[in-house]
Amino acid sequence: MLHYEDRIDLYDERGKLLEENVPLEAISPLKNPTIEKIVNDIKRSVAINLAGIENALKTGAVGGKACFCPGRELDLPIVENAEIIAEKIKRMVQIEEDDDTVVKLINGGKQLLLQLPSKRLRVAADYTVSALIGGGATVQAIVDAFDVDMFDAPVVKTAVMGRYPQTVDFHGANIATLLGPPVLLEGLGYGLRNIMANHIVAVTRKKTLNAVALASILEQTAMFETGDALGAFERLHLLGLAFQGLNANNLTYELVKENGKDGTVGTVVASVVERALEDGVIRPLKTMPSGFTVYEPVDWALWNAYAASGLVAAVIVNVGAARAAQGVASTVLYYNDILEYETGLPSVDFGRAEGTAVGFSFFSHSIYGGGGPGTFHGNHVVTRHSKGFAIPCAAAAMCLDAGTQMFSVERTSALVGTVYSAIDHLREPLKYVAEGAVEVKEKEKVI
């Protein structure tokens, strides 16, 4: 059952048509099978750093920074026996022989991807089951494989799971999940927003439009969870996901191509307005005595989607020219500011993206200046305020950064990137979401 008449064409990151005449709802998290799979796999997956565990035990440096326990070292050939450990983990975690449990060794056994059977999530209250089961199974597998006694077993636990439960998170652990502990969420329903931009960039291997897509999918899917993408506002968020996140109608790609060589934030604004007029998304309302034209939207939600596509294009053009991510906050701020002055229309997310950028600028490189753009996420107290339209810009910026950041992708997200990028639909969401949309299109018998 389709509620909206909108149709879109889906393109990949190179401007190649993937599928045309797609119903807007075919990219909805409630209908698209790939997006459902992305969310489910994020919840049930945990990255386990076997090489990190081995090194921590060998040196006695367990439990995070500055924690060193002389005399508690254990020299265990964990990576060498990775296949044995993986098999033991699988036996503990798997429920049925034919269930969807995945245990995959990566990088010569240095890392391991564990995906819990979906049934374990269905009988759990929240998604931390993946970290707790994954960590617990790894501890038991190592203890069993190397016959570790009761006095050294706690050291193994700390090498695997860090200081938890002395801390509410897994501080100093050698396991990692994309979703942080629920106790750290800024509000109800913010779980999918609690993934820093650097993680998204690492998972998509710095492919800009795929990083934008994954960030947008997570942010906009969260809007369905929080009750924002509901009723009168559902179409607004679906169009935002389509145009800003999934390069619908190739708009983002074309805006970047048009302005990439010698364009600025201002020329991107001009291109967006021109395209919106051509496509009948906005129209002139009146001309002032000064000659200034005030516009009105023909379609409010579609105007927001065009503006959001232009926003990420402006970030790509501006940050891409500098090859420095630090400018993303001011680009988000002044793109929206210029757009409002140029048209008399509301900017992206009806001002929330612009307002978010003010705080984003302050906390990323103003007087405070404590965090680089890549460390921010939709659950952050600074960047939570936009309803899904700001974090895709931060992800785009970090893809284009040429190593200027203290909090680089390599520093914050190496394990996450190595392990989670092995999941195809997380690494290349544009391609696989389009395939999912085709399934919906065929099911709904759309020609």
UniProtKB/Swiss-Prot annotation:
This protein's pathway: One-carbon metabolism; methyl-coenzyme M reduction; methane from methyl-coenzyme M: step 1/1
Enzyme Commission number(s) from the entry: 2.8.4.1
Residues noted as binding coenzyme B in the record, renumbered to the chain: 370
GO molecular function terms noted in the UniProt entry: coenzyme-B sulfoethylthiotransferase activity
Co-factor: note: Binds 2 coenzyme F430 non-covalently per MCR complex. Coenzyme F430 is a yellow nickel porphinoid. Methyl-coenzyme-M reductase is activated when the enzyme-bound coenzyme F430 is reduced to the Ni(I) oxidation state.
Cofactor(s) required for function per UniProt: coenzyme F430
UniProt binding sites for coenzyme M: 368
Catalytic reactions on record: coenzyme B + methyl-coenzyme M = methane + coenzyme M-coenzyme B heterodisulfide
Keywords: Methanogenesis, Transferase
InterPro entries (alphabetical): Me_CoM_Rdtase_asu/bsu_C, Me_CoM_Rdtase_asu_N_sub2, Me_CoM_Rdtase_bsu, Me_CoM_Rdtase_bsu_C, Me_CoM_Rdtase_bsu_N, Me_CoM_Rdtase_Fd-like_fold
UniProt record, GO biological process: methanogenesis
NCBIfam families in the record: met_CoM_red_bet (TIGR03257)
Record function comment: Component of the methyl-coenzyme M reductase (MCR) I that catalyzes the reductive cleavage of methyl-coenzyme M (CoM-S-CH3 or 2-(methylthio)ethanesulfonate) using coenzyme B (CoB or 7-mercaptoheptanoylthreonine phosphate) as reductant which results in the production of methane and the mixed heterodisulfide of CoB and CoM (CoM-S-S-CoB). This is the final step in methanogenesis.
Family in the record: Belongs to the methyl-coenzyme M reductase beta subunit family.
Oligomeric form and interacting partners: MCR is a hexamer of two alpha, two beta, and two gamma chains, forming a dimer of heterotrimers.
Protein name, UniProt field: Methyl-coenzyme M reductase II subunit beta
